[in-house]
């Protein structure tokens, strides 16, 4: 073999390769580029859809949080209103109870006053009866001073035994 020898197989291989590149470029390159372009468009569309869905999800989340905030606020308002109402009702009940207690107290004081007056009237009547009885006895007996003192002493003891 001669080092300068020209090998035909090499030329055929180079020509075959160039022919293959030409055929691929002519028939496969455009479909391959189109397929890659479609894939890129599809990926971009998927990314855009994902971003759109993410934005929608964030909007839904904000709406949900706003609804929850409103619900909490309404619940707090209902609780505050119920608390205020119960405090008012408790104050009304307490005022009514104080009023009723005052009525009962006044009634009891009036009853006590009437009973005291009645007892005083009874004692006065009994004292009057006893005074008349003593005077009657004194007049009947026409006693001496010593007898009168004994009679007065007995009268004082009888008055002391009376219920008040």
From Swiss-Prot:
The name this protein goes by in its record: ATP synthase subunit b
Assembly behavior: F-type ATPases have 2 components, F(1) - the catalytic core - and F(0) - the membrane proton channel. F(1) has five subunits: alpha(3), beta(3), gamma(1), delta(1), epsilon(1). F(0) has three main subunits: a(1), b(2) and c(10-14). The alpha and beta chains form an alternating ring which encloses part of the gamma chain. F(1) is attached to F(0) by a central stalk formed by the gamma and epsilon chains, while a peripheral stalk is formed by the delta and b chains.
Keywords linked to the UniProt accession: ATP synthesis, Cell membrane, CF(0), Hydrogen ion transport, Ion transport, Membrane, Transmembrane, Transmembrane helix, Transport
CDD domains on file: ATP-synt_Fo_b
Function of the molecule: F(1)F(0) ATP synthase produces ATP from ADP in the presence of a proton or sodium gradient. F-type ATPases consist of two structural domains, F(1) containing the extramembraneous catalytic core and F(0) containing the membrane proton channel, linked together by a central stalk and a peripheral stalk. During catalysis, ATP synthesis in the catalytic domain of F(1) is coupled via a rotary mechanism of the central stalk subunits to proton translocation.
UniProt family annotation: Belongs to the ATPase B chain family.
Presence of keyword Iron: no
Annotated InterPro entries: ATP_synth_B-like_membr_sf, ATP_synth_b/b'su_bac/chlpt, ATP_synth_F0_bsu_bac, ATP_synthase_B_chain
Gene assigned in the entry: atpF
Provenance organism: Desulfitobacterium hafniense (strain Y51)
